[in-house]
Every structure is written in C-alpha cells, then in structure tokens.
C-alpha cells in the first residue's frame, strides 16, 4: 500500500507523521509533560532542601557497605528525597536542619551503582561547597 501520493496529500502525510511521532520513545518523553510532575526537582538541575535525618543505606549485593545518606525535604515543593553524601567523612559536615543544595546523581532518574533508590547527591551545605569542606579549604560557617 505505502503512503499516499499526489497533489492533495500534504495534510494526510502531515497528520500521519504527527500521530506516528508518539511511538518514538524520546519524542514521547520530551512532550508528554511527566517530567514536571514526577521529577521532585520539577525539571530543574538543582534544588535546595532541609536535612531531616541522617540514614545509612545498605549497598546491593555483592557489595557489603552502609552508604551514608540523608533525608531531605525540598523547599520548593515539600517533597522528601534521599540524597547521597559523597566522600569519606563528609557526613560529619552535615547536620540536621541544615540547608543543603542537592543535584542529580548520574543516570537521570535512576539510582547509581550499588545504592538502591538514591537518585540525588549533596553538593553544598549551608551555602559552602562540600568538597571545599572535605579538602579543608573552607570551614563550616557558624550558625
């Protein structure tokens, strides 16, 4: 059968192409609008939040470790997320009720490595870079 040919087929070709686009995974993801609803950040790259508690998340098999994480409540929409605290000993710089800046953690919308269900990581604590605190370049501001 094939596609229609002729002088008056432009509308038919156009509408057919528009309908078929929705079968493309990338097009559907970009245009369906769930990015704003399902993503806790609401489409943004970073978000600020308040630390609720420190938790240890057990690593998946075959690894055996307790990954240091924190529960964070986002300021912009009140959603609660779990965020990973990178580097050895950086959990000591994070305290409850601190304001932290959270970013995505690698694979967009998916957990990374052996940490189940953790999709975000801590970047700043009390407006100070976590890496600067870790390396000793800056001190934690007095609150």
Swiss-Prot record:
Main location: cytoplasm
One BP term from GO: translation
InterPro entries, sorted: NA-bd_OB-fold, Ribosomal_uS12, Ribosomal_uS12_euk/arc
A GO CC term attached to the entry: cytosolic small ribosomal subunit
SUPFAM superfamilies named among the record's database cross-references: Nucleic acid-binding proteins
Example GO molecular function: structural constituent of ribosome
Locations listed in the record: Cytoplasm, Cytosol; Cytoplasm; Rough endoplasmic reticulum
Modified residues (Hydroxyproline): 62
Listed transmembrane segments: none
Keyword terms of this UniProt record: Cytoplasm, Endoplasmic reticulum, Hydroxylation, Ribonucleoprotein, Ribosomal protein
Assembly: Component of the 40S small ribosomal subunit.
PANTHER family: 30S RIBOSOMAL PROTEIN S12 FAMILY MEMBER (PTHR11652)
Protein name: Small ribosomal subunit protein uS12
Source organism of this protein record: Caenorhabditis elegans
């Amino acid at each position: 059968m094939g596609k229609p040919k002729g002088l008056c087929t432009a509308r038919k070709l156009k509408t057919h192409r528009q309908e078929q686009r929705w079968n493309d995974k990338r097009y559907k993801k970009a245009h369906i609008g769930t990015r704003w609803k399902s993503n806790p950040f609401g489409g943004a790259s970073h978000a600020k939040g308040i630390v609720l508690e420190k938790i240890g998340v057990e690593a998946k098999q075959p690894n055996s470790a307790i990954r240091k994480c924190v529960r964070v409540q986002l300021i912009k929409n009140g959603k609660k997320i779990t965020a990973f605290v990178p580097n050895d000993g950086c959990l000591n710089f994070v305290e409850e009720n601190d304001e932290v800046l959270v970013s995505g953690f690698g694979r967009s919308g998916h957990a990374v490595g052996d940490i189940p269900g953790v999709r975000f990581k801590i970047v700043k604590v009390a407006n100070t870079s976590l890496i600067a605190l870790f390396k000793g370049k800056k001190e934690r501001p007095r609150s």
